[in-house]
Amino acid sequence: HEATALVGFSQGGIMSLAASLQEANLCGRVMGFGSRFVELPVQAPETVTYHLFHGKSDNVIHYGFAVSAAERLVAIDADVTADVLPYIGHEIHPNMIDLAIERLTTHMPKRFYKQVQEADPGDSPVRH
């Protein structure tokens, strides 16, 4: 599941976001384009990273939903990136695709940082 990303645009993104909250270990990442949570989550799986992409000129699903979702995810200590792109409407724009590829290839999930912080230094394979 860790290598699986659910990707959705608009209603498909809404379904992907909802599925990640309903099914444990379904995926490691959710990429929502021009989408939103049906209801803002009260908790989120530690194993999921949320990547939200939204056009600021979206007249179907307002970009404020992405901002509110990101704020809530941060508040509940979930792993999230959020990108609101100016002059882009309700579409999967090439700039969003570029950002999605960048997020998939460069973003280190928060859970990995936590694992490193919680690791016992005596367990290190490096010997001095």
Enumerate the language-model features and the residues they cover.
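Short helix-terminating capping/connector loops at secondary-structure junctions
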Residues: H1-E2, F112
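Short, proline-enriched alpha-helix->beta-strand connector loops that line the catalytic pocket
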Residues: E2, P45-Y50, I76-D79
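Primarily recognizes the serine-hydrolase "nucleophile elbow" in alpha/beta-hydrolase
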Residues: A3-T47
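Alpha-helical and His/Cys-centered functional microenvironments
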Residues: M15, D58, P94
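Active-site-proximal beta-strand/loop segments in catalytic clefts of secreted hydrolases
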Residues: F33, G55, L85
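A short beta-to-alpha transition loop/helix N-cap that caps and shapes the active-site region
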Residues: F37-V42, V60, I92-H93
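Short beta-strand/loop motif that positions the catalytic acidic residue
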Residues: H51-H54, D58
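C-terminal catalytic histidine-bearing segment of alpha/beta-hydrolase fold enzymes
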Residues: G64-H128
